[in-house]
């Protein structure tokens, strides 16, 4: 979710923020997997508590930030701000709940790789269908590579490692992520300033309210023999891969090019896969490795294609300004 507000952060610090955010997001699924192992908490209840915890911490961040940061982002109309908050909140609900369900069903490595690999491709296709953005040859090749990677994961993984339902849930999660990004891009086409921190905070509030009925039906308080461990894991999910990671991501994404952000965010599925194998005992088959490489190559291809397109656009704009 890009942030179009201005930032005075140096590029080096912004890159560091994005790297930390990507690695932190990669640990969210690992924490969820541990919660599922030691309790009967479901993905909807976990998403609810993540929204509630993230909301509390982000409200604190809003209260502590300088007033001049608010003044720089006061230009967005109430209608557009409401649409952004509602859309982001609903998208977060779909994204988080489906992602945690995918991790529960098919494991951390596959669930994360499919979600983060399919997301950028769905964004590229969605931008073509809804806003007329050209895919180009690189985009088409990336989409084909992503589909091939998904096919390898589903058809070649084996029932013990890859479950089709989990892959479908991961694609649903990717769709929620893509919808948030496309909405943000569509609303930001006029280049107006937005308050990304406030939008995210109230989106988590919408998410918590929307998830409450289904999470209550699933069971808000899990049965577990290790209640303190579950509480600590929930606090971690709310603090590190939610409040901290989102704050760092928005600060860094305001400075770094979108193509570079896409490549750096590949740290999320990579770190999740490393945690899954080294700490959670998940097994990586040849099919999982091949499917993962195809998905990551597709995202990298999209990022470089976007960088080339942006460079051509800048040269054309520079030529037009000289001609005038």
Please annotate each region the language model reported.
Residues 12-17, 45-63, 142-144, 165-172, ...:
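Hydrophobic alpha-helical transmembrane segments of multi-pass integral membrane proteins
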Residues 1-49, 54, 94, 98, ...:
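Glycine-/small-residue-enriched transmembrane alpha-helix faces in small-molecule transporters
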Residues 24, 62-110, 115, 124, ...:
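Specific transmembrane alpha-helical segments of multi-pass solute transporters/efflux pumps
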Residues 26, 30, 52, 59, ...:
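Hydrophobic/small/kink-forming positions within alpha-helical transmembrane segments
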Residues 35, 46, 50, 102, ...:
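Hydrophobic/aromatic residues within transmembrane alpha-helices
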Residues 22, 111-118, 184-208, 242-278:
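Helix-helix packing/entry segments at the starts of transmembrane helices
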Residues 58, 135-156, 174-177, 275, ...:
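Hydrophobic transmembrane alpha-helices of multi-pass small-molecule transport proteins
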Residues 62, 119-144, 270-289:
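C-terminal transmembrane-helix exit sites in multi-pass transporters
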């Amino acid at each position: 979710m890009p942030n179009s507000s201005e930032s005075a952060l140096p590029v080096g610090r912004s890159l560091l923020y994005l790297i930390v955010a990507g690695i932190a997001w990669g640990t969210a699924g690992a924490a969820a997997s541990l919660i599922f192992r030691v309790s009967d908490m479901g993905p909807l209840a976990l998403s609810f508590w993540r929204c509630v915890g993230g909301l509390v911490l982000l409200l604190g961040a809003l209260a502590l930030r300088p007033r001049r940061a608010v003044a720089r982002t006061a230009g967005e109309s109430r209608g557009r701000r409401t649409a952004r908050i509602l859309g982001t909140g609903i998208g977060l609900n779909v994204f988080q709940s489906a992602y945690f369900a995918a991790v529960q069903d098919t494991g951390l490595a596959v669930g994360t790789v499919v979600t983060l690999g399919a997301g950028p491709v769905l964004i590229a296709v969605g931008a073509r269908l809804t806003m007329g953005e050209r895919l180009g040859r690189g985009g088409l090749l990336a989409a084909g590579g992503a589909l091939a990677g998904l096919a390898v994961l589903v058809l070649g993984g084996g029932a013990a490692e890859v479950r089709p339902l989990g892959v479908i849930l991961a694609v649903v999660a990717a769709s929620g992520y893509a919808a948030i990004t496309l909405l943000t891009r569509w609303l930001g086409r006029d280049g107006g300033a937005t308050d990304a921190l406030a939008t995210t905070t109230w989106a988590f509030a919408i998410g918590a309210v929307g998830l409450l009925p289904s999470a209550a039906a699933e069971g808000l308080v899990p049965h577990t023999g290790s209640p303190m461990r579950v509480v600590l894991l929930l606090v971690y999910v709310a603090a590190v891969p939610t409040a901290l990671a989102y704050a760092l991501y928005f600060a860094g994404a305001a400075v770094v090019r979108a193509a570079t952000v896409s490549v750096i965010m590949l740290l999320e599925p990579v770190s999740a896969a490393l945690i899954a194998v080294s700490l959670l005992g998940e097994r990586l088959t040849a099919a999982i490795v091949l499917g993962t490489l195809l998905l990551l190559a597709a995202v990298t291809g999209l990022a470089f294609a976007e960088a080339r397109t942006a460079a051509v656009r800048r040269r054309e704009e520079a030529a037009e300004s000289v001609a005038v």
